[in-house]
Amino acid sequence: MAFFNLHLLGYQNSFRSKKRDKTEETNQKDPVPTRLPPIFSEDGNYSVHQNSHTKYHEAVRKVSLKTFPNQVFRVPLTDAQNFSFWRSNAAGARPEETMPWIQNPRHCLIKSAMTRFMDHSILNDRNFSLY
């Protein structure tokens, strides 16, 4: 905010301010508390860590967990992330199926203007050569 001549506001961390708060999204599906944790995680990272604590920390260190930007941040940080905020996080879901408005009919031009010009010139003048 220093570019608006507003000073003494403290350190601004724009990335952290846009990050999702995990406490606001926790909703208990099962009102009865279970004694054991779930075997399969719902975040899609089970194939990476396979419920192993050491494999999980290694995946965190190597940043190989499959998290999407819309799972981490509330709003897109860059313009390139806008598309990932529209997409669903379901595995195997194609964007054309979930958002049919992104499909566009293709009208292919089989012969370009230069190709048509060359065909027309060759038919009219047998001695015509481009070179």
UniProtKB/Swiss-Prot annotation:
Protein name as it appears in the record: Sperm microtubule inner protein 11
Complexes and interactors: Microtubule inner protein component of sperm flagellar doublet microtubules.
Claim: Cytoplasm is one of the keywords in the record: yes
Name of the gene this protein is made from: SPMIP11
Annotated spans, Disordered: 17-44
Subcellular location: Cytoplasm, Cytoskeleton, Flagellum axoneme
PANTHER family: TESTIS-EXPRESSED PROTEIN 49 (PTHR35263:SF1)
Free-text function comment from the UniProt entry: Microtubule inner protein (MIP) part of the dynein-decorated doublet microtubules (DMTs) in flagellum axoneme. May serve to reinforce and thus stabilize the microtubule structure in the sperm flagella.
UniProt keyword Cytoplasm present: yes
Covalent S-S links between cysteines: none
InterPro entries: SPMIP11 (IPR038775)
Pfam families with a match to the protein in the record: SPMIP11
GO CC entries: axonemal A tubule inner sheath; sperm flagellum
Record organism: Bos taurus (Bovine)
Tissue spec. comment: Expressed in sperm.
Record keywords, A-Z: Cell projection, Cilium, Cytoplasm, Cytoskeleton, Flagellum
UniProt-listed GO biological process terms: flagellated sperm motility
Chief localization: cytoplasm
